């Protein structure tokens, strides 16, 4: 009929299925809500990267000055506590008495007399001489550090450049406390005795002698080699021109020490072929030989 709705031809789904579909549709929404809610009820804060509050205009130059940043950061509110240090009271030094009163006998001498403890010098210099002051940082020669060149080791063959034995080759034994080197020829080979020499005036060669087993006497020190002053003879009546100067003579102790050291080194030198002739020969420069180009 006119004015009436046409009957719905679509089939209606059962109610059970509709209810099930409503429950399934409500589950993801509930899950989404559960994810968004924080257990404490607050949203988690995002971690911000650490950066300065003073933006950089150019490399090394900030927008705000140091005083401006001091007020922006409110650094004036901070309380600084300095470490407490105990200050010990200085002990008063006892005053040293300059004078002493002494009793003096005699009726007319007054009974006492004031005497100075520190007496003034009896004689004074005719010219003013400035007093030498110890400078800070400078140590005496006895306290200097003794350094040895890396090329000089016990048993190294050295070439002496100065003195009466210049040009001769010797064997280095050890370094003394003064920094000088103790060397020997040996005496039988090149007539160089036990003596001291400075490492400045020596050329170290690559040739070495094994002296690890050699025992050097402990009394071979700087005092042992110190030159003794010869006494000047006093003139007597009638012997003005007949007096003779005292001459230096080698002691028996030196001769014994020389033999003791050389007897230990000689077998080791003879064991190496051509080493004996090398030590006996003298070093010299000829035409076309340049020291800075030579390999020792």
Curated annotation (Swiss-Prot):
The modification Phosphoserine is found at residue 135. It is found in: Cytoplasm, Cytosol; Cytoplasm; Rough endoplasmic reticulum. The modification N6-succinyllysine is found at residues 102, 215. One of its GO terms (cellular component) is nucleolus. It holds the Pfam family Ribosomal_L6e_N. Residues 1-14 have a biased composition (Basic and acidic residues). GO terms for biological process: cytoplasmic translation; translation at postsynapse; translation at presynapse. It comes from the Eukaryota. Coiled coil: none annotated. Residues 1-53 are annotated as: Disordered. Keywords: Acetylation, Cytoplasm, Endoplasmic reticulum, Isopeptide bond, Phosphoprotein, Ribonucleoprotein, Ribosomal protein, Ubl conjugation. PROSITE patterns: RIBOSOMAL_L6E. There is a cross-link at residue 5 (Glycyl lysine isopeptide (Lys-Gly) (interchain with G-Cter in SUMO2)). InterPro entries: 60S_ribosomal_eL6, Rib_uL2_dom2, Ribosomal_eL6_CS, Ribosomal_eL6_KOW, Ribosomal_uL6_N, Translation_prot_SH3-like_sf. GO terms for molecular function: structural constituent of ribosome. The modification N6-acetyllysine is found at residue 247. Residues 17-28 have a biased composition (Low complexity). Residues 29-51 have a biased composition (Basic residues). Belongs to the eukaryotic ribosomal protein eL6 family. Component of the large ribosomal subunit. The ribosome is a large ribonucleoprotein complex responsible for the synthesis of proteins in the cell. Component of the large ribosomal subunit. May bind IPO9 with low affinity. This is Large ribosomal subunit protein eL6. It comes from Mus musculus (Mouse). The gene is Rpl6.
């Amino acid at each position: 009929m006119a004015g009436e709705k046409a009957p719905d031809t679509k089939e209606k789904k059962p109610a059970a299925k509709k209810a099930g579909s409503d429950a399934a549709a409500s589950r993801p929404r509930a899950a989404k809500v559960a994810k968004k809610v924080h257990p404490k009820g607050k949203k988690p804060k995002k971690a911000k990267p650490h950066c300065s509050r003073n933006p950089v205009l150019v490399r090394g130059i900030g927008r705000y000055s140091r005083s401006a940043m001091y007020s922006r950061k409110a650094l004036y509110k901070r309380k600084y506590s300095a470490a407490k240090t105990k200050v010990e009271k200085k002990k008063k030094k006892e005053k040293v008495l300059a004078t002493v009163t002494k009793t003096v006998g005699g009726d007319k001498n007054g009974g006492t007399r004031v005497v100075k403890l520190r007496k003034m010098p009896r004689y004074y210099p005719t010219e003013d001489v400035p007093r030498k002051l110890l400078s800070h940082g400078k140590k005496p020669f006895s306290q200097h550090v003794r350094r040895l060149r890396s090329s000089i080791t016990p048993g190294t063959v050295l070439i002496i450049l100065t003195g009466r034995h210049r040009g001769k080759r010797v064997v280095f034994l050890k370094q003394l406390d003064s920094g000088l080197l103790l060397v020997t020829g040996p005496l039988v080979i090149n007539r160089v005795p036990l003596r001291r020499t400075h490492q400045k005036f020596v050329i170290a060669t690559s040739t070495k002698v094994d002296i690890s087993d050699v025992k050097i006497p402990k009394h071979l020190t700087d005092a042992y080699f110190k030159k003794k002053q010869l006494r000047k003879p006093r003139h007597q009546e009638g012997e003005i021109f007949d007096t003779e100067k005292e001459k230096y003579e080698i002691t028996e102790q030196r001769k014994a020490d020389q033999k003791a050291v050389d007897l230990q080194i000689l077998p080791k030198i003879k064991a190496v072929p051509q080493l004996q002739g090398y030590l006996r020969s003298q070093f010299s420069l000829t035409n076309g030989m340049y020291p800075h180009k030579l390999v020792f």
